Amino acid sequence: MASVELPARGRLERRLDGVVEDNRFTIAVVFPAVGAFTLLASAEALLPGPLNFNAYLLLFGVAVMRLPLVAGVAPLVTRRAAVGLFALCGYTYAIETVGIATGYPYGTFEYGVNLGPMIGGAVPAALPLFFLPLVVNAYLLCLLVLGSLADRTAVRLPVVVTAVVGMDLALDPAAVSLGFWAYDAGGWYYGVPWSNYAGWVLSAAVAVGVLDRALDREKLFARLERCRFMLDDLVSFVVLWGVVNVYFGNWIAALLAALFGYGLWRTDRFDFPGR
């Protein structure tokens, strides 16, 4: 039987799958481990000046770690999904702009590290690269953990929102310790005010609701079961922020990162063939 030629998009998606599959351990473990070392060395001013918190190296590393998630979701991006993801990008910029200008909903804070080009001199242009994967990774992990319970909206959405907030409970203390940003009023949770997490409940609820409507959940779950690397970006999250939190003694945040690692282990996502 003659082989059927894939359309250009299909060929690109298959090629991206192959690149990620062949380099899973490097992308999901080596990159975040090196990233953690580089960030900690930058925080201690141990690197040559231009390399300390180099924004373009940082963005390159983050983009590489996002590849498994991008490759995993790409075949599911219909026109409806694209509109939803575009809306989420706009929402990310909007709520961050409001937050910086008013201190609501996260609390008053300022960036302390160059995160690349800024929009209006205030909001990082790469913000969706940081925000959206938190929501998508939480959504995917919860689909696996909940199983058939994920069919119930009243269960699925609150659990995913809780997972997103839990991820920020692991991330924000590490980011503050590194000096990525600082809250004017501080906070007893490793320098982070609880108002930040109240804000995250709000922003996560909106983002999860949009994502839930944008993606076909049945097709997403089917792809998730077939695509072994689809949650590797969450593996990177556990490695990177777990290491940083341990270094600074943020033990609760480190344990939360480890909890997500446990979720990955329970769902059989720590498998890196050919490493």
What is each of the regions a protein language model found here?
Residues 2-275:
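Aromatic-rich, lipid-facing transmembrane alpha helices and their immediate juxtamembrane interface loops
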